[in-house]
A protein has these predicted regions:
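Periplasmic c-type cytochrome electron-transfer domains
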Residues: 34, 56, 140-147, 174-177
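Structural microenvironment flanking redox-active thiols in thiol-disulfide oxidoreductases
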Residues: 92-152
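Thiol/disulfide oxidoreductase modules built on the thioredoxin-like
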Residues: 148-203
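Short, small/polar residue-rich loop motifs at catalytic or cofactor-binding pockets
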Residues: 52-53, 76, 173-175
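Hydrophobic beta-strand anchors of alpha/beta hydrolase catalytic cores
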Residues: 78-79, 113, 178
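Short, acidic, Ser/Thr-enriched surface-loop or helix-capping motifs
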Residues: 61-62, 182
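Short active-site neighborhood of thiol/selenol oxidoreductases, capturing the structured segment around
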Residues: 67-93, 97
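N-terminal targeting signals for export/organelle localization
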Residues: 1-56, 207-211
Length: 211
């Protein structure tokens, strides 16, 4: 009788183990197996995940109309927050972005260099349009009210602060990150100031081709 009980117990235990192993083998364990279609493209890691950057924003386009993020990012976009009176880093970074756009165009990938001004007082529509012409023929620029710009900056977790000065040639401290934003997906990647245009182009191409 004892042997029979042992056999029954062993059979039940074996069945339980088999069911458990089958469940583990066929059930995805979140978040470790969560699919990321862009995993092979990513060079950076965002604290809180990519969903924590971007979202709904409103800005003012070159024609004076108010536009949403859906209109701003209708194409794959390389987005930079800066100001036209910036004496050094802004021209370097947006020119680098323009070079990446040209490299992508050689691969038949259309991207838009986007410039969002953090200095609405001096960056009028006329000033922004002249700035865009100097950088790239497809560059689009946006401005807005202080509140609109602050909201967009917060959405993309950028930093900017106007230096205290009565001089009209005041400087604005700001972060120097460029963001890759895709239609339907929103923010997907960021590029630091020292990223080369070649790396930007290669990474952007990977995201676009897998979108």
């Amino acid at each position: 009788m004892t042997n029979m009980k042992n056999i029954v117990y062993l059979s039940v235990a074996s069945l339980f183990i088999l069911i458990s192993l089958t469940y583990l083998a066929t059930t995805p364990i979140w978040p470790f197996n969560k699919e990321d279609k862009f995993a092979q493209c990513r060079n950076s890691k965002v604290t809180g995940g990519s969903a924590s950057i971007g979202g709904t924003i409103e800005l003012v386009a070159a024609d004076g109309s108010t536009v949403s993020d859906f209109e701003i990012f209708s194409q794959p976009s390389l987005v930079y927050f800066g100001y036209t009176f910036c004496p050094d880093v802004c021209p370097l970074h947006v020119s680098r972005n323009a070079d990446a756009v040209d490299m992508l165009e050689e691969r038949s990938i259309q991207t838009t260099p986007v410039f969002i001004s953090i200095d609405p007082t001096r960056d009028t529509q006329e000033v922004l349009q002249e700035f865009a012409k100097m950088i790239h023929p497809r560059m689009v620029t946006y401005t807005g009210s202080e509140e609109q710009i602050r909201s967009a900056s917060k959405a993309y977790r950028t930093y900017y602060k106007k230096q205290e000065s009565e001089d009209e040639y005041y400087l604005v401290d700001h972060s120097t990150i460029t963001y890759l934003v895709l239609p339907k997906y929103g923010f997907v990647e960021f590029f630091r100031a020292d990223t080369s245009p070649e790396v930007m182009a290669e990474t952007t191409a990977c995201f676009v081709e897998n979108s």
